[in-house]
Amino acid sequence: MPKKLLILGGTREAYELAECLVSQFSPEQLTVISSLAGVTEHPRQPAGEVRIGGFSDTTGTGGKSGLQNYLLQEKISLLVNATHPYAAQISENALAAATELQIPFLRKTRPPWVKLPEDHWIEVPDMEAAANYLIDYKTISQNELYKHSVFLTIGNRGLSIFRKCNKNRFIVRTVDPPKEAYSWSEAIFLEGRGPFTLENE
């Protein structure tokens, strides 16, 4: 029986890892399963086996317990979290599920951006704080930021938080058009799937 490895993926790093493992190990040695959240309509298919959607069990329970049920049912030998850095909930559930079941767990992280002396960053703890900053800042300095453009590359799930910033114009990079695309007059949506060339950026 081959060992089974589950990759929580959807990121470039997850695709690269799946491709590397499938090329290095035979099916008799290792079964590589990539789990995609199902947020994009036509996701790129990673190497190996693929499952799409949340981890709900027969009772409709998702989250940590749904993931644990899947890990047990499929006899997963190793869990790899290669999700997006902003995917806080699944990351928390994955660590808790693997720890409680005593399944080996790896977190594949991407190196953070490094602030250079000439950079001007405004650092906030989360999306809600970023949206609130835009609201407060435009109130203090309306002439400077009023109707200026804000570039969002945060995925579709966090977009609703920024709808309250109605004094700003948004340019949103997205893989699939979100429901906000039809009702958010202050936003322009640019559809595309990375990785992007320097010219595309």
Task: Give the role of each language-model region.
Residues 162-193:
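Histidine/lysine/aspartate-rich catalytic loop segments that bind and position anionic ligands
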Residues 3-39:
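N-terminal basic/disordered segments at the start of proteins
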Residues 4, 77-78, 149:
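Structural motif
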Residues 103-170:
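Hydrophobic, well-structured mid-protein blocks that either form specific transmembrane helices
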Residues 34-42, 108-114, 155-158, 174-180:
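Short, polar loop motifs at secondary-structure junctions
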Residues 32-58, 180-187:
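N-terminal beta-loop-helix "entrance" segment that forms/cooperates
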Residues 48-71, 190-201:
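Glycine-rich, highly charged phosphate/nucleotide-binding loops
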Residues 64, 68-133:
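Glycine/small-residue-rich loop that forms an oxyanion/phosphate-binding "nest" at active or ligand-binding sites
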